[in-house]
C-alpha cells in the first residue's frame, strides 16, 4: 500500500476537509449564542453579452453587476434578544419606520473552526440589516422539536479575512 500523500499543500498534515458544524457568528464585538445554521454566503456576477455588427457567429461576454445573496441565520430559541433587538432597529411597531438609522446596519463576522477548536477561516460580511425575522418556527403539539428563530440579513458584500491563517496540524 502506498503512503497517503498530503492533499492540502498549504497544510500538508491535513488530509480531510473542514467540517460544517464548528462555527460562530459575531456582531458588535459579541458572539451570538445558539446559532445552528448559516446559509447564503453566495456571490453572483451577472453576464453582459454583446455582439459586434460585423461578427455573425458569436457574442462576447463580460462581467456585469455583482450581487450578494441574503445571509440566513437560524438558532434554537433562547432568552437572548439579539435577533429581535437588531430587527427592532430597522422597524419597530408604533415608531412606523426605522428606529435607528445610525445603527441598523452592522458588519458581521462568520468564523470557522477545525476539530481542535482552532480558528481556520473567517468571513467579514458588510453593512447587513434584517429584512426578515421569524421569532418562532411552526408550533405543533404532535411533534417534539426545538423552536427555531430565524433572521434574514441583506448585505452589501463579503470577503474572506485573509489575516486568519489555519494553524499547522500536528
Where are these regions (language model features)?
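Glycine-rich, low-complexity intrinsically disordered segments
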Residues: 2-170
Amino acid at each position: 500500500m502506498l503512503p497517503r500523500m498530503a492533499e492540502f499543500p498549504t497544510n500538508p498534515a491535513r488530509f480531510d476537509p473542514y467540517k460544517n458544524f464548528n462555527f460562530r457568528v459575531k456582531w458588535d464585538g459579541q458572539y451570538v449564542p445558539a446559532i445552528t445554521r448559516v446559509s447564503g454566503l453566495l456571490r453572483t456576477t451577472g453576464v453582459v453579452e454583446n455582439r459586434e455588427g460585423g461578427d455573425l457567429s458569436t457574442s462576447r461576454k463580460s462581467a456585469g453587476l455583482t450581487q450578494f445573496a441574503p445571509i440566513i441565520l437560524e438558532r434554537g430559541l433562547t432568552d437572548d434578544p439579539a435577533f429581535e433587538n437588531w430587527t427592532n432597529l430597522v422597524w419597530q411597531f408604533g415608531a412606523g419606520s426605522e428606529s435607528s438609522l445610525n445603527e441598523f446596519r452592522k458588519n458581521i463576522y462568520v468564523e470557522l473552526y477545525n476539530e481542535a477548536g482552532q480558528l481556520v477561516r473567517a468571513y467579514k460580511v458588510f453593512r447587513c440589516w434584517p429584512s426578515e425575522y421569524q421569532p418562532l418556527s411552526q408550533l405543533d403539539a404532535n411533534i417534539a422539536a426545538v423552536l427555531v428563530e430565524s433572521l434574514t440579513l441583506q448585505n452589501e458584500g463579503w470577503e474572506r479575512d485573509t489575516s486568519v491563517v489555519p494553524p499547522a496540524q500536528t
